[in-house]
């Protein structure tokens, strides 16, 4: 969508002239850009048309150039070079070599036979004892395989000492059935009537008497307390407490601070007369639930 220019002609000319001065200052150090431009205009004159383009080259981008053509495979194997002068000097020897004669000597003939045998020999492949070619995988651990005839012999079973100090060998597989314990178990399975009867467990209604029986401890006032001797004190039996002078000093110091009467027995809870009394609730009816 066309819009009217935001700047007038004078301001546009000033921007163009400023751009020329800035570009000249970026590439040249002379102080007069106008004189430099006039000198270039007189020397170079009007710009000529661009030269015609050359032959178009359709080169593939980001692609490797094609490899050169492979050389032609030779038909027959080149003859072995003859020992001696040029071919034209001894024509008779060359004729013998062309007809299958050994012009180079017996050593050269043996070497040619060895090379021909090596080329015609089939490539050998390493195979395992089952005929499967061994192809080690990269990063896999090598595992030793032995043919049945070369399998390593296992060590004999290690013995153990019996109760009498005699060494008894460990039996494996079918030999373990000949042990006395195994024979006794097999005989018991065959004759179920001869097995020992399992004793009957006592009924829960008549449990056996516990070895821990409670006993009564009578105080000086004649009241008795039921105490069970099955109770275990984690810190041991309590010892008689005999307060020292320091304990009584701390007791009277606490009485002065908390404004309470002293205790006769330091194990008794303290009494604070100024503390509010606990609310006592008395219920004169019973709640029945059905």
Swiss-Prot record:
InterPro entries per record: HEV_TT_vir_Orf2/Gyrovir_Vp2_N
Entry-linked Pfam families: TT_ORF2-like
Compositionally biased tracts (Polar residues): 191-200
Biased composition annotated in UniProt, kind: Basic and acidic residues: 121-130
Residue ranges, compositional bias (Low complexity): 181-190
Disordered as annotated region, ranges: 67-218
Protein name in the entry: ORF2/4 protein
Species for this entry: Torque teno virus (isolate Human/Japan/TRM1/1999) (TTV)
């Amino acid at each position: 969508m066309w819009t009217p220019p935001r700047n007038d002609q004078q301001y546009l000319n000033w921007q163009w002239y400023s751009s020329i001065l800035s570009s000249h200052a970026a590439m040249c150090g002379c102080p007069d850009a106008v004189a430099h431009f006039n000198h270039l205009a007189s020397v170079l004159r009007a710009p000529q048309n661009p030269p015609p383009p050359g032959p178009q080259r359709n080169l593939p981008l980001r692609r490797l150039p094609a490899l050169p053509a492979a050389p032609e495979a030779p038909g027959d194997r080149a003859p072995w070079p003859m020992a001696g002068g040029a071919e034209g000097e001894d024509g008779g020897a060359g004729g013998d070599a062309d007809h299958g004669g050994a012009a180079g000597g017996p050593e050269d003939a043996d070497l040619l036979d060895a090379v021909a045998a090596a080329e015609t020999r089939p490539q050998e492949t390493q195979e395992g004892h089952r005929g499967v070619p061994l192809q080690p995988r990269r990063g896999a651990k090598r595992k030793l395989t032995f043919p049945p005839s070369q399998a390593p012999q296992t060590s004999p079973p290690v013995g153990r000492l019996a109760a009498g100090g005699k060494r008894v060998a460990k039996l494996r597989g079918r030999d373990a059935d000949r042990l006395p314990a195994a024979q006794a178990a097999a005989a018991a399975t065959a004759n179920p009537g001869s097995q020992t009867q399992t004793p009957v467990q006592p009924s829960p209604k008549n449990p056996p008497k516990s070895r821990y029986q409670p006993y009564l401890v009578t105080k000086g006032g004649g009241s008795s307390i039921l105490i069970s001797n099955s109770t275990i004190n984690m810190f041991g039996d309590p010892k008689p407490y005999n307060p020292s002078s320091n304990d009584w000093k701390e007791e009277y110091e606490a009485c002065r601070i908390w404004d309470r009467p002293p205790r006769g027995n330091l194990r008794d809870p303290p009494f604070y007369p100024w503390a509010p009394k606990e609310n006592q609730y008395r219920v004169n009816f019973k709640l029945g639930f059905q």
